[in-house]
Amino acid sequence: MDPEPSLEIASQVDFTLAFGFIGIVILLFCSAIVSGAEVALFSLSQKDVEDSIQENNSKGKIISELLEKPKKLLATLLVANNFINIGVVILFSFIGKNIFEAIDSPVLKFTIEVILVTFLLLLFGEVLPKVYASRNNIKFAQLVVYPIAVLDKILSPISIPMREVTVFLQNKLGKQKTNFSIDQLSQ
C-alpha cells in the first residue's frame, strides 16, 4: 500500500524546514565567528600579539601574520561575512515560504521576513559576538585563528583586488587629515 500523498508532502515540508533551520543556525554561527574575529583581531595590541606568540607559538604566529596585512584581513572578513549573510537571507526566504504561507498579503509576508532575518543577523551574527569578542579578545582570536587563516587563503582572489582598489581610491580621494598637535592648536 502506497503512503498517503498528504503525509508524503508533509514529511517533505518538515524535512525541508529542518534542513533550512539547521542551515540558518550554521550560517549564523559562521557569521558570529567572522564578526567576532574582526573585533578580536583588530583590538589586539602589539603586546597581546607578542604574548600570544610566547604562550601558543603556532596560533600567535598566525595571528601576527594575519595582522601584518590588516587591509587584506579586513577585506577577507567583510567578504566572508557578506557571503554568509546573503546565505542566511536566501535560506530564510526559502523556508519563509512554508512558515508564513498562511499570510495572504505578499507585502506583509515580505515585511515580516525582512524584520525577522534582520533581527537574527544583527543579534546573533553581529552584536553578541562582537560584545563577547571585545571582552575576550585574546581568547577569541586564538579560538578562531585557524578558520580565519583558511578563509584568508580561500578569499585571497577577492580580497587582494578589493584591497588594491581601496588603496587606489584612498590615494585619489586624498590623504586622511592628521590630528592637530597641542602646539598647533595654541597658535
Residue spans of the language-model regions?
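Membrane-embedded alpha-helical segments of inner-membrane proteins
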Residues: 1-187
